[in-house]
Regions:
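A Zn2+-metalloprotease active-site environment signal
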Residues: 2-280
Length: 280
């Protein structure tokens, strides 16, 4: 007969199991998509520096647009539409990035044939008339685009790219010491990245970043009461627009059936959020 006498777990093992259980509970309890934590590379660059640069570059862009009579006035129907959609999405951003609660959000429309939109760090959103007019986007589809771009800012993808750049530059200079600098956050790398003056308007994101932005954006839209299934029709329209020449917005974004497939695979995670938002 086997000995069923209870044998106490070693204290260190018990503590490890308790820690694992504690850290896994929030993930199990959370509704919506699962994209993991933010990249450690973003910690190499101060968030304040990135947001300050974004504010300056955004202001310059608006000044240039205004000088060309291409900045949509606040009473423009499309401007009102974009700002109304943003007002529904913004309340759900703080969960993804606590700093977003203090961002000075801005939403503007720029007259241009470019099929493009973006959200810079700090909540600086801009749409080009081309993406609205050429693709004839519904409100749900606009919310998917906006959610995607806002997700880039919330997940600090620009900050991550700048951090990676700092590591690359530091590696050439410091050789093997770069590993220690990543773990210890060498201030020289931080300073180099902060002084780099990255053009946040033209910064390209990785395929992983784009996939993450798709999913987080879809959840933001769903929580705001916009149908996340619009992500499928959006990318179908993008694909059709891509037949002749790739729109600027697509040139740095992965496309194709795999993207739609990933959105469809995650719909069960966000459709309940959408239905709940609709019921109010």
């Amino acid at each position: 007969m086997p000995n069923l006498t209870h044998t106490p777990l070693p204290r260190r093992l018990l503590l490890a199991l308790m820690l694992c259980a504690a850290t896994s509970l929030p993930a199990l309890a959370r509704e919506g998509v699962d994209v993991g934590g933010n990249s450690a590379f973003s910690k190499l660059v101060p968030a304040e520096s990135v947001e300050r640069s974004a504010t300056q570059q955004y202001a310059q862009l608006l000044q240039q647009a205004a000088a060309q009579n291409a900045l949509g006035p606040k009473d423009n129907a499309q401007v009102r539409r974009l700002r109304a959609i943003a007002q529904r999405i913004i309340p759900f951003t703080g969960v993804w990035n606590p700093r977003a609660r203090d961002w000075q959000w801005e939403v503007n429309l720029i007259g241009s044939r470019q099929v493009n939109a973006f959200c810079m760090p700090g909540g600086k959103i801009a749409f080009y008339t081309g993406i609205l007019n050429q693709l004839k986007l519904s409100d749900d589809e606009v919310a998917m685009v906006m959610g995607h771009e806002v997700a880039h800012a919330l997940r600090e993808h620009a900050r991550k790219r700048m951090g990676k750049s700092a590591v690359t530059q530091g590696a050439a200079r410091l050789g093997g010491a770069v590993v220690a600098s990543v773990l210890g956050i060498d201030p020289r790398l931080t300073d180099a990245a902060a002084r780099g003056g990255a053009n946040l308007l033209t910064l390209e994101f990785s395929r992983e970043d784009e996939s993450e932005a798709d999913l987080v954006g879809m959840e933001l839209a769903a929580r705001a009461g916009y149908d996340p299934r619009a992500g499928v029709s959006l990318w179908q329209k993008m694909g059709a627009a891509n037949k002749n020449a790739p729109p600027q917005w697509l040139s740095t974004h992965p496309s194709g059936k795999s993207r739609i497939k990933e959105i469809e695979a995650n719909l069960p995670k966000v459709l309940p959020l959408y239905e709940r938002a609709r019921r109010g």
